[in-house]
Amino acid sequence: MESSSSGTTSSTIQTSSGSEESLMEQRKRKRMLSNRESARRSRMKKQKLLDDLTAQVNHLKKENTEIVTSVSITTQHYLTVEAENSVLRAQLDELNHRLQSLNDIIEFLDSSNNNNNNNMGMCSNPLVGLECDDFFVNQMNMSYIMNQPLMASSDALMY
């Protein structure tokens, strides 16, 4: 009987070792499936991140292009305004010079008028009176001087 009990024990051991191997094999397959699923989820996350970053890059490139265009337009406007401003400065200088010249003429006429009034008494108002023979005193000649056009060109601009 001894032999029969040892035979059942060995078959039980073989069966239990077979079931352990089967159980280990199942666990191994389960781990493999779990690892595959985890790797698939990881790849999906990476792909989503890559897609998001690509979309962000495209958006930033578009925004950068818009900013560069805006800066270019603003620079052109600035240069145009700067050129116009330079012309206006030149015209201002010319007008100031002409005003100073006219003030000098008026001052000269006033002093000349005072001398003439003291000496001859002929001209009472140098800007209105036609009785004076002086070229600068004659109103027709004064209108000629005052109606000269202003000349300013962008070529002669000084900053």
From Swiss-Prot:
The gene is BZIP11. Keywords: DNA-binding, Nucleus, Stress response, Transcription, Transcription regulation. It is found in: Nucleus. Residues 27-48 are annotated as: Basic motif. Residues 1-21 have a biased composition (Low complexity). One of its GO terms (cellular component) is nucleus. Highly expressed in stems and flowers. Expressed in root tips, cotyledons, leaf vasculature, embryos, apical parts of siliques and funiculi. Induction: By light. Induced by hypoosmolarity. Repressed by sucrose (at protein level). Its main location: nucleus. The keyword Zinc-finger does not apply. One of its GO terms (biological process) is negative regulation of translation. It holds the Pfam family bZIP_1. Residues 25-88 form the bZIP domain. Residues 53-67 are annotated as: Leucine-zipper. Forms heterodimers with BZIP1, BZIP9, BZIP10, BZIP25 and BZIP63. Interacts with ADA2B. This is bZIP transcription factor 11. Transcription factor that binds to the DNA sequence 5'-ACTCAT-3' in target gene promoters. Promotes POX1/PRODH1 expression in response to hypoosmolarity stress. Positively regulates the expression of ASN1 and POX2/PRODH2 genes, which are involved in amino acid metabolism. Regulates several metabolic pathways such as myo-inositol, raffinose and trehalose. Regulates several trehalose metabolism genes, including TRE1, TPP5 and TPP6. Mediates recruitment of the histone acetylation machinery to activate auxin-induced transcription. SMART domains: BRLZ. A highly conserved upstream open reading frame (uORF) coding for 42 amino acids is essential for the BZIP11 sucrose-induced repression of translation (SIRT). Plants over-expressing BZIP11 show severe alterations of plant growth and development, reduced seed set and viability. One of its GO terms (molecular function) is DNA-binding transcription factor activity. PANTHER family: BZIP TRANSCRIPTION FACTOR 11, BZIP TRANSCRIPTION FACTOR 44. Residues 1-47 are annotated as: Disordered.
